[in-house]
Amino acid sequence: MAKKDGVIEIEGVVTEALPNAMFRVELTNKHIVLAHISGKMRQHYIRILPEDRVVVELSPYDLTRGRIVYRYK
């Protein structure tokens, strides 16, 4: 997995599945963010369900939206 500069990676738990591969994720610091699946996860048909533990990448510009980059087994 390539590391990007300037992004914040944080763990969270998926609380709700929304349309168009969007998810509501509660982060470990109790914030709620709206996240979508990264392209590689979509390409490899990795399914995400509520209650899954995931890693979310946040941009420093908008901390309310993110990208799910990893799902724990």
Swiss-Prot record:
The keyword Repressor does not apply. One of its GO terms (molecular function) is translation initiation factor activity. Residues 1-73 form the S1-like domain. InterPro entries: NA-bd_OB-fold (IPR012340), RNA-binding_domain_S1_IF1 (IPR006196), TIF_IF1 (IPR004368). One of its GO terms (cellular component) is cytosol. Keywords: Cytoplasm, Initiation factor, Protein biosynthesis, RNA-binding, rRNA-binding. The keyword Protein biosynthesis applies. Disulfide bonds: none annotated. It is found in: Cytoplasm. Its main location: cytoplasm. One of the essential components for the initiation of protein synthesis. Stabilizes the binding of IF-2 and IF-3 on the 30S subunit to which N-formylmethionyl-tRNA(fMet) subsequently binds. Helps modulate mRNA selection, yielding the 30S pre-initiation complex (PIC). Upon addition of the 50S ribosomal subunit IF-1, IF-2 and IF-3 are released leaving the mature 70S translation initiation complex. NCBIfam families: infA. Belongs to the IF-1 family. Component of the 30S ribosomal translation pre-initiation complex which assembles on the 30S ribosome in the order IF-2 and IF-3, IF-1 and N-formylmethionyl-tRNA(fMet); mRNA recruitment can occur at any time during PIC assembly. This is Translation initiation factor IF-1. The gene is infA.
